[in-house]
């Protein structure tokens, strides 16, 4: 199980509604190990933790609960202006952008160059654009198709 803790339940700070410090601490009540990733915006920390727990599960040891602390930059929905957070709080978390941090890691460790990363980003944007064009030019699905490929009646 993976708990992505963005520190808010809609607009309520999580710390004000739970009686423990972190959700992963609940795991022991269910007899499963709980794991904590303090910086869920660090892709390598997340990868390394999941490499460990996936092997644990594949070895037949049962489930685990992993919690990662991260941040939701925008409101919970389009009707949520996010006024319960300060601009400073949001700006501080934006400095921890996982994509920008990982790009920096790749460049710093000479795994990829800035131009190689830009090429991957461009290819991804092009693929999304093509998918949108395909979706917009495709016929609307039929009502009957809503019931295709389901697992149970």
Where in this protein do the model-derived segments appear?
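C-terminal intrinsically disordered, low-complexity extensions immediately downstream
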Residues: 137-153
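Glycine-rich ThDP/TPP pyrophosphate-binding loop and its adjacent helix/strand module
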Residues: 1-137
